[in-house]
């Protein structure tokens, strides 16, 4: 099993609002500066229809799981060199786990 903390939905919601909401949505399939995060778990990188990804994101071919998101969110530019995402990352493991929990719960909701 993974070493990812369980995550807290409410704390993750706060992290999302502070660090992600400016560029991403999780409650629709729309894109903003970044692609929708709704349904990201289980999706292959660079595949949201209508979003203009960098070649790096398209070519990475990673399937987003809790584990891959946990690693990615630590340092996006290290995980996918050449990504257009300007976010520096979340250094605290608990914040990454909380954010993943929030995205997971919100993605389970019907649109």
Swiss-Prot record:
GO terms for molecular function: electron transfer activity; heme binding; metal ion binding. Gene3D superfamilies: Cytochrome c-like domain (1.10.760.10). Signal peptide: none annotated. Binds 1 heme c group covalently per subunit. Heme c binds at residues 20, 23-24, 85. Keywords: Acetylation, Electron transport, Heme, Iron, Metal-binding, Mitochondrion, Respiratory chain, Transport. The modification N-acetylserine is found at residue 2. It is found in: Mitochondrion intermembrane space. The keyword Transmembrane helix does not apply. Its main location: mitochondrion. One of its GO terms (biological process) is electron transport chain. Electron carrier protein. The oxidized form of the cytochrome c heme group can accept an electron from the heme group of the cytochrome c1 subunit of cytochrome reductase. Cytochrome c then transfers this electron to the cytochrome oxidase complex, the final protein carrier in the mitochondrial electron-transport chain. Belongs to the cytochrome c family. This is Cytochrome c 2.1. It comes from Caenorhabditis elegans. The gene is cyc-2.1.
């Amino acid at each position: 099993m993974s070493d990812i903390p369980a995550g807290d939905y409410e704390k993750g919601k706060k992290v999302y609002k502070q660090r992600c909401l400016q560029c991403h949505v999780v409650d629709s399939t729309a894109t903003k500066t970044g692609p929708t995060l709704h349904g990201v778990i289980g999706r292959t990188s660079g595949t949201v229809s209508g979003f203009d990804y960098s070649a790096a994101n398209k070519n990475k071919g990673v399937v987003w799981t809790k584990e891959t998101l946990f690693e990615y969110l630590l340092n996006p530019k290290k995980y996918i060199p050449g990504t257009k995402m300007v976010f520096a990352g979340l250094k605290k493991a608990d914040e990454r786990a909380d954010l993943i929990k929030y995205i997971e719960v919100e993605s389970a909701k019907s649109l």
